Regions:
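Short, solvent-exposed recognition patches
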Residues: 79-196
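Alpha-helical transmembrane signal-anchor/signal-peptide segments
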Residues: 57-73
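Envelope-exposed proteins and targeting segments
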Residues: 72, 98, 109, 204-206
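Intrinsically disordered, low-complexity segments enriched in proline/serine/threonine
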Residues: 18-21, 27, 72, 132, ...
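Intrinsic disorder/low-complexity segments
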Residues: 1-35
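Membrane-interface elements of multi-pass transporters and channels
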Residues: 4, 56-57
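A short, solvent-exposed beta-edge/loop patch
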Residues: 35-48, 54-55, 146-244
Length: 244
């Protein structure tokens, strides 16, 4: 019996039988039309519709390749480009990536930029949170907090993370880019995937992450400023590569 059915025994003594009962529903039938049963039916129908949508291929979205990402971003210029190891790519399963190091002025610590784009997150390929990836690479997260980021005339949030590995200390800034949204919270980003899959037949998105080392005796505010300046320049062009 379904979840909406009332549990217990049916009182046959109070259930009409015979020819006179054939033209009208029984009291037990009315029980099956209870609000709980109707709600269960709607939920089941919604789940079936969601499954059907998930099984449909999401349409390709026009975008520029990350290999074309600007080498000059405001006052920063690219000094190095790297490739991700094949075994790491097999785990992350991105559609497109870029890994670069940018510098602003001589003697200042570099800022690394990592962007991963996933064209379809309805199946195995999904954004991997740095909260998991950084510890997996041997980094210990010592602090994490959200900070404001200017985005499209308003304010969004990114994650500022301080990490350590032995004597090496770095500061990271990252967010999830979700169809024109800058999102700090991974669970909110996952909710947006389902929303956009229904509303727009899209489940694409990406991760944008910056990291910089602390110079000797450098304060966190100084390293944070370096990350924010490059992040602001990146936000000016990111929609070409991770579409709105």
């Amino acid at each position: 019996m379904g979840h909406g059915a009332v549990q217990g025994k049916v009182d046959l003594g109070n259930t009409p039988v015979g020819p006179r009962a054939a033209g009208r529903p029984s009291a037990f039938a009315f029980r099956l039309l209870s609000p709980t049963a109707l709600l269960f039916s709607y939920l089941l129908l919604g789940a079936l519709l969601a499954l059907a949508l998930l099984q449909r291929a999401t349409p390709a979205v026009a975008r520029a390749q990350l290999a074309e990402f600007p080498k000059e971003l405001g006052a920063f210029h690219m000094i190095q480009e790297s490739e991700i190891a094949p075994n790491i790519l097999a785990i992350l399963q991105p559609t497109d990536t870029v890994v670069r190091a940018y510098a602003r002025q001589p003697g200042e610590p570099l800022v690394s930029l990592y962007i991963a784009y996933h064209a379809d997150q309805s199946e195995g390929s999904r954004v991997h949170s740095p909260k998991s990836c950084l510890p997996g690479a041997g980094w210990q997260i010592t602090t994490i907090k959200t900070i404001p980021l200017a985005w499209k005339g308003g304010e969004s949030k990114g994650n500022l993370v301080r990490v350590e590995k032995g004597l090496d200390k770095q500061l990271a800034l990252y967010w999830i880019h979700s169809n024109g949204r800058v999102v700090a919270n991974e669970y909110v980003a996952r909710a947006y995937i389902f929303h956009d899959l229904f509303a727009r037949r899209r489940s694409d998105g990406g991760l944008v992450r910056f990291m910089t080392v602390f110079a000797p005796e450098e304060r966190e505010e100084s390293a944070k400023e370096r990350l924010l300046v490059l992040a602001e320049a990146t936000l000016q062009v990111i929609s070409r590569y991770i579409p709105d």
